Amino acid sequence: MHRPRSSWPNLVWDHSFPHHVLTQGKYTTIPYRTYICLQGNETSLKEAEWAIRNDNPRALVKSYNKELWTFTLQEGVTPPSALDRFQLTETTTGVFLPSTTTPSSLTMTKQLTPPGYVALMLAIEAMIQEALKRDDHYVPFGNNLILPVTGDLLHLDARLTPGGDLLLQMYQQETEWEMFGKRKRDVANEIVGTKVVVAPTLVEGVVENSTNQIPDNLPVLLEMLDCLCSVRLRAKKQWTAVRIDTEVLLWPTELLFVDRKSATGKLEDEGKDALLWTEDILDSVFEATQLIRRGESGVNTNESTAAQPQPAQNGTNSMAPAAGTTNATTQRNEENKQIYPTPPEAPKRILPGILLERATAPAGGWGELDEELFGGDEVTEADFNFFDDMGGDKNDTDGDNDNGNDNDNDKADAMDVDVKEEAKKEEMIKKETKEEVPVKEEVQEEEPDESATTAALLTNNPAEEKAVVHGVNDSSTVNGAVDAAVSATVVSSVPYLPSDFDQLIVNPAEQRTFALVEFNREAEQRLNDKYAAGGRFFVPDDSSSDNEGSSDNTGDSSDSGDGSESVPRDVKRQKVDEGTLSDQTDEPEIDAKQLHQQWSAILNYNHDDKPAKKIDSSNDTTNSDGNSNNSNYEEAVQRLAEQVVWDNSCYKGLVPQENYYRPPSARFVKVVEQVFGDTSKRLSLIDFAKMSDKGGQQQPGVGMPINAAAGTAGGGPGTPVTVSNASGVPSGSSGAQASQMGALAVGSALSPSRGATPQPEGSSPETRPSNWTPGITSQVNSAASSPVPLQQHQQQQQSFSPMSPQTPAQAPVPSANSFANAANAAPTQRLATPMYSFMRGGSLIKAQPPILRFWSTFGLSPRNGPKPLTLTLIYPSGTAIGDAAAAFLISFKMCYEGCGFGLVTLGGSNGTGVVSSDYKNLDVSREGVLLVSNPYNDVLGFLNLAKAAAAGSKTATSTSTILTLPCSIFASYTALRAPSAMLLAALCRNLYDHLPPTSTKRRYGSVIQRQAPACVISKPVPPFINFKLLANTPDSVINEDSLLHVAYAASNRWITCAWSDQWGELAKVKVFCLQSESGPLRTLEEVCTEIWETTLQLNGSTDVRSVAVAKLGGMLDDELAMWLRVSSVTRGRRITPFFLVVDNRPSMVVTGSDDGSKGGNVAGGPAPAPPTGAAGAASTGSAPMSTPFRDTDSPDIYNHVTTPSVGEDKIDYDDMSIVDVHDEIHSVTLNHRQPLTMHSTRLGLATGYLVKTSPLNPNQLLVFSLTFVNCPCVVMHVAMKHFLRQYRNLISLAATTGVCDPEYAIVPWHVEAVDKMMRLVEEL
C-alpha cells in the first residue's frame, strides 16, 4: 500500500558505499625472471617454487606453462632467484609493463594475453593463500579456499589494470560442505558409504571406515601436502579409509568433506513421491524389458556379484564393468549398431609394463604418416574402423600392408611373438569372462592375502589403479564443442613429487584421449579435439550391422577374424624390450612407490576435468523405437521446463537454489591488509565505477628486457623478448615457446563452471569477418571451441556479411573520448519502475506493478478481453483427496471469473470438473484446459508425469492446454490446505496468459507459450521521432519498440533458450538436448542456427529492428564469430544484432554504507527533503505551514465543494499509488572495461550493473551484470544505459509473471528462465 516517502528506506547511496575490491598500490613496472629446465624435468620447477616460498612466504613465485616465474613489487629489489641445486636455466630478465594488457590498434586481429600477466596473477593469489593457510587455518578446496569450521568457500581474483592498479576482489560463498568427522556419529562408523570429496583436489570417493592406524609412509604424504598444496595437518589426526572407484586408501579425516544435507540424514528417501500409491507404467515396462534381456544374455542379476570389481590376471586389466553400473547402456549399444564406441576405450588394453616404457621412452612420432593418418579434422567411418575393429586387417589404415611393410613383419623378433601370445591369452580370458561368470571366483583365489597389505593401501591391484585414473578422467560423454564454449579450463598442476622419490607418476589431470600413442604434438592436439566428444558417433551406414558380434556387453571390441592371427593394434605399435615385457607378467609388490603413485594421482587431480553426468537410461527408453523415445523424452523435458518457468514459486523445491556471494570475513580482510601493508585500500562503489583505463600504447611482448638493447624487441604482439641461456639454447624452445603461443585465460570471474579454453600449441591466429569487433579478441582454442575447423573458418572469411546494410564494415571499439564522456555523466542512477497497461471499467489505464496483486480488489480486467474455457482437474485416486480437489476447483473457477478472465465451464463426465486417475494411463484428450495435480516431489517423478502427458497428447483427438499444479497446494496428510487469494489470482492470470486468443487471427500461432497476456508494460511516449535518413547507424540505435531479447545458457548436454520482447507481449522458452540416446550429436552451431531461425520467425510478426543475444556465462571469441556468421542471415530484413554476456551471480559484492542506513548515495547529491503529505510532496516538496485555529471546523465541510477547473490550481494525485519498496533498482555504468575472464586481458566493450537491496540483509545488495562483447554503437555507455533500462523492465516482468520471487527479482525474466531451466535439466 501507499507509504509516505518520509518512511521509505534511503536507497540513494553515498560515496561510503563499500565495494569489496582492495587496491594494493600502483605499479608501472614489475621486474621479473623466468627459468626453464633443459632436461625437461618439471619436478624441479615445483621444487624450486616450494623452496623459494618456504624461505620467504611473501615471495612472488609461480610455476606456470613449463616455466618458473619470479616477480617483485618493491622498487630497487630484484626478483627472487632459483637455487642452483634445482638445475634451472635463466632465460629472461625483464620488466613487465601493465600497459601491454590493453589493445590499442584497431587493425589487430588478435589480442594475446601476455604470459607474464597470468603468471603474475597466479603468484599474487598464491602468496595470499599461503598467508591465509598459515594464519587463518584455511584449507585448499580446488582452486579456492574453504574454512572447515563454517564450510564457507573463499574466492580470490587478482587483476592488474592497464594503468598499473593492482586490484584484489574478494567474496565468500556459503556452501553445504562440512568436514567429515565433525559429527560424532561419522567417526563412529554409523554412516558407511557416505559420499565425500577429498581435499584439496576434490576427488570424489565413498567412506569405507575410520581407523586410528597411521600410514607407514606418513612423512611422504606430509611433505607432498606441504609442497603441492601448502597443507599442514594438525597434531591429532584421524584417518578414514576412502574408496575411489576401485581403490581404497587412507586419507586424513580433516581433509574429507561431506554434503551437509546427507550428513544430517537427509538422504534420497525425502525425494520419493508425495503419494506412494502411484507407479509410472513406463518404468515397469523398462524393468520388465531389462529382465528379459538379462535372461536371454545369461547375465547374472545378482547385485552383490555385479558390484564386485573384476580382478586382473597376469597383469592385464579387468574387462568387467565398473561397480554400480547396469547393462542398460550396453543393451542400447546392441540396438543402435550405427553408434560406435570411441578411442577412449583403447588405452585399457595397454599393459602396465608397456605404460612404464611409454612414460620413459623418448618423444617420437609417426613421421610422414602423421598427415595421412591423423591430419583430417572430419569424423569419418574409417576413424572408428581404425580404433574399434580390433579384429582382422581388412580395415587397417596404418599402412602395415603397403610399401613393403610385409618385410618388416618378417623381421619381427621373438619379442613380437611374445606380445602376440600375450594378446591371445588376453582374448581367451575375455571370452571365458563373458561366457562363464564363475571364472571370477577362480581369479579371486590368486589375489594376495589382505594381511600382507600395508595400512596405507588396502587394494594393490595395478590394473584397478589404472581404472581409477581412467575413471576419474573419462570424458566419453562430453560434447567437445559445447564444453569448450561453456566450461572453465584451469591450468592443472604439474606432476610432482619430492626429488628423492623416483617413480612413475600418473597425473589424471593430463590424461588425454590419445595420451598413450606417440605422434607429433600438432596431430595429437587435433585428435584430442576431434574425439573430445567421446562416447559415440552417428555413422549412417547399413554395413555397420555386419560387425554385430564384434562388441561385447562391456563396450570393448573383440576380434571378428581369426583369433590366432590378430593382435590389437595398440599392442602391435609398442616397441618394448625384454625386461619391460617380463615385468608385465610378474605380480607387483607392495612398496612405497605404489603408495606414492596413488597419493600423487590424488593430489594432481583436476576437478574441472570431471566427466559430465551420464545420461540416465531409465528415463530415456520407453519402447523399441529409439527415435520415438528420443522425441518423447525431449518433448517431456520441454513440457517440464514450461511448467517450472512460470510456477509462481510452486515448484521452488525442485530447482536447486544458488546462493549469492557474500562479503568476506573481517579476519580475511585483515590478513590481506597485513600482507600488503599500508598500500592496501578498500574501494567504494563510486570510485570503482569512475576508474578509467589509462594504459598506453600496445607494447610488444611482456616488456623490454633489462639485458637487451633497445630496438631488439622484435616479434609480434604478445611475444616475449628473451635472451640466450648459458648453454646457447634459445629461450624460444620448450617452455618459452609454449609461453608465447600457449598463453591462456584460466577460470572465469563469472562462475567456477564458466570460462575460457587454453590455446593449443602450434595454432595460428585466424582471420576475422568484416563485422568483427577487435577490441575484445583474445587468445582462445579455435580448434576445440569453434564448431568449424580453423582452416574452414579461414576459407569462410569472405562469406560474412555486415550486420545491416547501413552498418559500417568495421565495428568500432570504445575510444578514449567515449569513456571520457561517460566519466562526465553520472555513473549511477535510479531506474524508474515501469507502468503496466490493463483495462478498468472499459478504459485502458496504466499503473505500477504492485496493483496487480490486488487485481480483483480494484476491479481490473485483461486488456485482450475474456478467454472462456472448459476446466477439468485430474487428481490421484482417493476419497479424501477428491473432496479437496473439488473444493479447490470451485475456488479456482470463482477466482478466474471474478478477475474477469472469462466464463469457466466445468468438464468431466458428471459435470463436476474433477476426474480421478491412476496416472498410468493419463487421458489428456479432453476439451479445454486440464489442471493436472502433480503428486511428485522430485524431478524424475515430475518428468514421468510429463512423459505420460506428452504420450497422451499425440493420441488426443482435440487440442487441450495442460497446466500442472502440486498436490500440496490443496491437499495434505496432516492439515487442511488452501491457496491464498493472491496465489490463486496469480495462477489464474498465468493460465489466462497461456491460453491462445479467442480471435481467429493469431499473431504468432502456436510457436510461443504466452500470447495476448492480461497486462503488458505500458509503452511510454517517445521523447523524439527519429526521421533522419543516415548512411551509418546512429548511436541511439535502440529506439522504442524495436528490440527483441534472446537469452541462452549452455552445458555439456543441454542448451536452454528464451525469447522476449520489451513489453511482455511475447514469451517463449525452449530446451535443446545435445546428447540424445539415439541419433547424431548436435553441435553448438546447429542449435544456435535453430535459435536464430526462431528469432527470425518471431521477428516476422513484429517491427523489431534490433536483436539482443545474451549468453549466461562466458562467450569465447570463436563462439562470437559463429554468432556473427549465423546472424548474417537476415532474409531481407534490416536487423542489427547485439551480443552480450550476463551473470546473475557476479563476483562484485557490495554491502551497505557505514552509517547503518539501507543503501548509500550512488546518484550523488543531497537526498530530497521528505514530505509530510501527498499534496506537499507533489507540489512544493516541503512541509506545509501550520494552520491556526485547527480545532475550528472549516465551513467547506458542510457545503458542496465543486471540482476545480482546468485553469485553477489542482492537486497532483500521481503520487497516490501503490509502490513496492523492495522493487527499487539502481544502475551502475563502469567507466572502464572489465575483463571477461579471470586471469586474462580479454576486455568487454562496456559493463553495467543492476543493484537492489536484499530483503533478508538490508546492508547487502543483489547484483546483476551485463557486458557488451559486440555492439554496433560508437558510444558504448549510451547503449549500455539503454540496455540497463530495458533489463530493468524485464526484471519487473519476472516478478509479475511468476518466474521468480518479487522480493528477490534482480534478473530479467528471460535470463532467469534459462538459468532456471538449466538448473532443472541438470538434475535429470
UniProtKB/Swiss-Prot annotation:
The keyword Ribosomal protein does not apply. GO terms for molecular function: transcription coactivator activity. Keywords: Activator, Nucleus, Repressor, Transcription, Transcription regulation. InterPro entries: Med13_C, Mediator_complx_sub13, Mediator_Med13_N. It comes from the Eukaryota. Residues 546-566, 618-631, 724-743, 785-816, 1172-1184 have a biased composition (Low complexity). Residues 408-442, 567-578, 607-617 have a biased composition (Basic and acidic residues). Residues 398-407 have a biased composition (Acidic residues). It is found in: Nucleus. Residues 296-346, 386-455, 535-590, 607-631, 694-816, 1151-1198 are annotated as: Disordered. Its main location: nucleus. Residues 298-331, 750-784 have a biased composition (Polar residues). Belongs to the Mediator complex subunit 13 family. Component of the SRB8-11 complex. The SRB8-11 complex is a regulatory module of the Mediator complex which is itself involved in regulation of basal and activated RNA polymerase II-dependent transcription. The SRB8-11 complex may be involved in the transcriptional repression of a subset of genes regulated by Mediator. It may inhibit the association of the Mediator complex with RNA polymerase II to form the holoenzyme complex. Component of the SRB8-11 complex, which itself associates with the Mediator complex. This is Mediator of RNA polymerase II transcription subunit 13.
